[in-house]
A protein has these predicted regions:
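Acidic, surface-exposed loops and disordered segments
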Residues: 1-297
Length: 297
């Protein structure tokens, strides 16, 4: 038994090799009898993705103290491609919310799905700050808005005042410019050392949004809240974001009375379908331009 607790039930194993074929780091080998194993010293390379565990057709593999009998079975009861596309086409950014909490059952479903969001290299170390109570949200909302309003009136806190100067009068008038009256909020932060730090929070929130909207819950990607969190340290402390983590992005959510009657008609993106051709070296000028564009935010 290794540090990973990679265990093979020899009574069940059919020697199909699927666990080894699907191992992302290629550390699953076979002993002389054809049973899979992870050699001592290779445990450190395991991503703990559990693919070997999931793909075994007979449930012969346990890893990381996970037992196959404790997992749901994939029954292929998936939505059709038309149903998935319909969900994508009809999702909308919601800026008008009921002033009430989600029911506990719906909130629990949303919490439970978060762990299934993939992360780069299966880092799986995101921090999620969840406000699931409207009273807590209102306290956070008021603190944020009052801090920004004070900065705008004094013109002393330049990073904050510059970012929100355009909305100064709305803050003065008490408008909820940032949070749009949302009763709930999800803030995803990521370790600064994570291999795919920029995208991991976005992946999680993309999964969260589609699942939330399938439950009739409105969502909003909130760049203003992300800016506020990055400029006002008190807010990060309130959300218990650990040291060594940076705010990735923010999503607001809650029930809404808005009912959209049809899908929008967005313009197509510019898609370059690449045909077979030689790859020629870029000129010096083209290299400089590309380095410049890739380095921008």
């Amino acid at each position: 038994m290794s540090e990973l607790n990679f265990v093979v039930d020899r009574e069940k194993c059919i020697h199909c090799g699927k666990c080894s074929d699907d191992c992302a780091t290629g550390i699953i080998e076979f002993d002389r009898e054809g049973f899979p194993l992870v050699k001592s010293g290779n445990e450190q390379y395991c991503m703990k993705c559990q693919h070997c565990f999931a793909i075994c057709p007979v449930g012969a593999i346990s890893i990381c103290n996970k037992k196959p009998e404790d997992s749901d079975i994939c029954d292929n009861n998936l939505p059709t491609d038309e149903q998935v596309l319909n969900l994508i086409q009809h999702r909308k950014s919601i800026r008008n919310y009921r002033q009430e909490n989600l029911d506990k059952a719906t909130m629990q479903k949303l919490k439970d799905m978060l762990k299934y969001s993939p992360t780069g290299c299966n880092n799986h170390k995101l921090h999620i700050a969840l406000i699931d109570d409207i009273e807590v949200m209102n306290r956070f909302r008021n603190r944020t808005n009052n801090t920004i309003k004070k900065a705008l009136l004094s013109n002393k806190w330049l990073p904050v005042s510059k970012k929100f100067e355009k909305f100064k009068q709305q803050f003065i008038d008490g408008k909820d410019v940032i949070f749009r009256g949302a009763p709930h909020m999800l803030v995803v932060s990521v370790p600064v050392t994570a291999p795919c730090a920029p995208v991991d929070p976005i992946i999680l929130l993309s999964y969260f949004e589609l699942y939330a909207q399938s439950l009739g819950v409105g969502t909003l990607w909130c760049g203003f809240a992300e800016i506020a969190l990055k400029l006002i340290p008190d807010l990060c402390q309130y959300l218990e974001i650990p040291d060594g983590y940076k705010v990735g992005y923010v999503m607001l959510f809650g029930k809404t009375d808005l009912k959209y009657q049809r899908a929008t008609q967005p313009e197509d993106y510019d898609i370059s379908v690449i045909e077979p051709h030689e790859i020629f070296p870029a000129t010096f000028v083209d290299k400089v331009k590309r380095y410049f564009w890739n380095a921008l935010r």
